């Protein structure tokens, strides 16, 4: 029977970094799988986790919690048929956990999986953000968790530490609170039982993708297509993502400057550069970069903002950063 953990957390809390750490620490004799959902249409996390050795299914473009749309169940069924020892499920940071947990706890899957501890990653600096305090998904991700992981502790100032202590006292329960940085948690916590149950409200949201729902596969380029972009919006957040063919190679320094200076809430990417692959993960002013020698099959960049941005201007800047390029026009 497959052991399952749901790992939630709002945008920029460090879920993908935590997954990479857990996968690096997994027992060598075990087979692990990942079911990941992203708010954007492009599918960045699949590229960032591609070298993890785990079997991976992506549900891009919206919300895994929309289980009536079937992609969640299809992806889950496909992975369970391979009988992995453990399945880690990462919903989008804008997702609501209720429908996912309800599905996993249903009789339909009782013979296939054991739901273990649900973890919620928290950047305590977000506790001082009034907009997030009023966001039901932010609140309910925390409310549904068995274990709270206060991540990015190395970035906290006194106000963030105070907010974390006040929040913990206000909960009035004895749930485990882990403090860490860079998602470095002991994999043994995954074996904790699912014990914290609370009644959560139903989520209310509506996705507006720029293209038909892509199901359980990230967007791909058509033969001969140099690049394409896709848009999505929900709950007052807007995403724009681009895919570039393997013919496009980006200027490393110029791209890093674009990532650092562009006034957006969130930027993630796995991009082909002369040196191989540049992995980018920026939330606010927090920026993580990683280079890999092996180039990616294509380049993917996704941005998220809390207001609609000038996507055409951002796109023009990106296109200008290519030092080699596929000239076939996109449609």
Predicted regions and their residues:
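Nucleotide-state-sensitive switch-loop elements of NTP-binding domains
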Residues: 2-13, 17-131
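Helical mechanochemical/support elements of P-loop NTPase systems and associated helical scaffolds
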Residues: 3, 68-71, 96, 134-137, ...
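Conserved beta-strand/loop subsegment of P-loop NTPase cores
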Residues: 33-34, 88, 113-123, 142-153, ...
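Short, hinge-like loop/turn segments at secondary-structure boundaries
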Residues: 50-53, 106-107, 136-138, 166-168, ...
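Alpha-helical scaffold elements adjacent to nucleotide-binding pockets in ATP/GTP-utilizing enzyme cores
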Residues: 78, 99-103, 141-144, 163-167
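Flexible active-site lid/hinge loop adjacent to a nucleotide/diphosphate
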Residues: 128, 132-144, 150
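C-terminal accessory "lid"/substrate-recognition subdomains
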Residues: 147, 155-297, 307-312, 316-331
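Flexible loop/N-cap segments at domain edges
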Residues: 303-304
């Amino acid at each position: 029977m497959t052991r399952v953990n749901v790992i939630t957390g709002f945008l920029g809390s460090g879920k993908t970094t935590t997954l990479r750490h857990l996968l690096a620490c997994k027992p060598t004799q075990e087979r692990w799988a990942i079911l990941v959902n992203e708010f954007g249409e492009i599918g960045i996390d699949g590229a960032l986790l591609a070298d993890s050795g785990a079997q991976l299914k992506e549900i891009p473009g919206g919300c895994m919690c929309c289980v009536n749309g079937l992609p969640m169940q299809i992806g889950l069924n496909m992975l369970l048929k391979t009988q992995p020892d453990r399945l880690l499920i990462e919903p989008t940071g804008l997702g609501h956990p209720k429908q996912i947990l309800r599905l996993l706890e249903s009789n339909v899957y009782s013979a296939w999986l054991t739901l273990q501890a649900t973890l919620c990653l928290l950047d305590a600096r977000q506790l001082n953000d009034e907009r997030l305090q009023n966001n039901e998904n932010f609140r309910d991700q925390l409310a549904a968790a068995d274990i709270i992981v206060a991540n990015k502790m190395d970035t906290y100032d006194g106000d963030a530490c105070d907010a974390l202590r006040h929040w913990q006292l206000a909960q009035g329960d004895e749930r485990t609170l882990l403090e860490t940085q860079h998602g470095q948690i002991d994999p043994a916590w995954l074996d904790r039982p699912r014990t914290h149950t609370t009644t959560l409200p139903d989520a209310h949201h509506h996705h507006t993708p720029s293209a038909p729902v892509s199901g359980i596969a990230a967007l791909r380029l058509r033969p001969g297509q140099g690049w394409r972009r896709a848009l999505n919006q929900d709950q007052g957040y807007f995403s724009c993502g681009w895919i570039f063919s393997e013919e496009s190679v980006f200027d490393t320094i110029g791209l890093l400057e674009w990532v650092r200076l562009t006034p957006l809430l969130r930027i993630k990417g796995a991009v082909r550069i002369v040196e191989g692959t540049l992995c980018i993960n920026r939330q606010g002013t927090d920026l993580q970069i990683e280079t890999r020698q092996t180039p990616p099959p294509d380049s993917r960049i996704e941005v998220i903002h809390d207001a609609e941005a000038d996507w055409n201007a951002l796109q023009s800047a990106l296109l200008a950063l290519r030092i080699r390029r596929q000239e076939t026009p996109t449609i």
